[in-house]
A protein has these predicted regions:
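Alpha-helical segment of the N-proximal tetratricopeptide repeat
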Residues: 2-22
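Short, charge-rich amphipathic alpha-helical segments embedded
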Residues: 22-49
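Residue-level signature for tetratricopeptide repeat
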Residues: 6-10, 40-47, 77-85, 114-118, ...
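Start-of-helix register in tetratricopeptide repeats
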Residues: 2-3, 36, 69-74, 108
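Short coil turns that delineate tetratricopeptide repeat
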Residues: 32, 65-66
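Alpha-helical repeat scaffolds
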Residues: 17-27, 50-65, 87-106, 123-199
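Charged, helix-prone or intrinsically disordered regulatory segments positioned adjacent to compact structured domains
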Residues: 60, 64, 75-82
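Short, structured coil/turn linkers that connect adjacent secondary-structure elements
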Residues: 39, 72-76, 110, 141-144, ...
Length: 199
């Protein structure tokens, strides 16, 4: 997944949408459909076919996800975020309005704040909410959330248990992910020699 994801992002950033779509299809064939891959397809639909293509694909997703309120909401916001005409202010206003529906529901409020606003999180408290809801999605989504939570914790100087860092070091020998390697390098950890080129 990581190698294909890097390949996909290279195609996306170079505006080679045809190859980007092929790579997303390869990822889904090899490791399954994920919330991440659906979000990327919405971006590609917007770039290739404009707003109409974006909304057509969203409509197809919502038909399948109609009984899952969390999934439907995330897909709608991913679609909105992919729109070329969406400003950051408009996006944040829409998210703030949406979050008001969950002010009495701490778990859902924190989860959507994390997923939609990329807010600073309290590592100890919010991590359990994030993974509690993310566990209904794919392994890719769980993995991405884990890395993102660690990145934000590190950036905001939130202490992360040494046991977690030890596990990350072990995993870094198996998974060639530059995000994980960078976290270890910034901590002053020795990165596995075979992976140094990605730091």
């Amino acid at each position: 997944y990581i190698k294909l994801k890097n390949t996909y992002e290279n195609y996306l950033f170079s505006c080679n949408y045809k190859e980007a779509k092929k790579t997303i299809s390869k990822i889904e064939d090899k490791v399954g459909i994920s919330l991440w891959s659906c979000g990327q397809k919405l971006i590609l639909a917007e770039q290739e076919k404009g707003l109409e293509g974006n909304k057509r694909l969203l409509s197809q997703y919502l038909e399948v996800a109609s009984k899952n309120r969390v999934l439907s909401a995330l897909l709608e916001f991913f679609s909105y975020r992919a729109e070329e005409g969406t400003s950051l202010n408009n996006y944040n206003e829409k998210v703030d309005k949406f979050l008001k529906n969950f002010e009495e529901d701490e778990i859902t409020f924190h989860y959507f704040s994390y997923k939609l606003q990329l807010q600073k999180i309290d590592f100890e408290d919010d991590m359990k909410y994030i993974f509690q809801i993310d566990c209904q999605f794919s392994a890719i989504d769980m993995y991405n959330s884990f890395i993102e939570v660690l990145q934000r914790a590190f950036a905001n100087e939130i202490k992360v248990d040494e046991l977690i860092w030890d596990r990350i070091k072990r995993v870094s020998f198996l998974i060639d992910d530059f995000r994980m390697n960078n976290l270890l390098a910034f901590r002053g950890e020795k990165v596995h020699p075979a992976l140094k080129k990605n730091v």
